[in-house]
Amino acid sequence: LIIGAVIGAIGTVVAALIRNRRVPLTYHVRHDPVGISASDSVHGNVEVTIGGRPVQTLYMSNVWLVNRGWRDVENLDVTVLCAENGRLASASACIEGEPIALTHTDEHQGEWDSYKEAWEHRECAKASGDQAGLQHWDDAVQAAIKNLSTRRCYAVSVLNRGQTTRFTHMMEFAHGADPGIFLSCQKAGVRVQYKDPY
């Protein structure tokens, strides 16, 4: 009996050590349709816009990232990626139950700052009639938009055991395309997996 208890205790400790080597983070996604632009003879023209720009199909996409491990995770960089047939239009992120929104990683914020700077240079070149400068800065703006419209990178300072981070994005997709959004996190000791909530 004593030998069985000792073996059981050792097995429990070994299992806990193996389990705690990696922190399992799971995520699930819900896409709620907001609107579809259409034109037909019965209802006429319906146009969905975001920021004054027309879109074909607009979704509100929520992604929940849950720490299902036995320990807290610090300094986590989480990247939200949009499927190639879509575009991230606007975004917000927070740890549920916390009043403060998450910020972008320093690198991602630098990309936003570079985009804003390129936009300002483009507008100056446009106002001054500098066609070569306008073409250069317009190319830089378009490249930044393409990059920033497919992903967002967030800095999560601490994700405690059992806590959930929620990422909310307005996303646009072409007619008939299935919405797709994914999470990535490159950190030693952390494993991110998609898991259906039900």
Where are these regions (language model features)?
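Low-complexity, acidic Ser/Thr/Pro/Gly-rich terminal tails and inter-domain linkers that flank the onset
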Residues: R19-P54, A83-A91
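Asparagine-centered strand-capping/turn motif at beta-strand->loop junctions
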Residues: I50, L65-D72, V80-C82
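Extended, hydrophilic extramembrane loops/domains of integral membrane proteins
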Residues: S157-P197
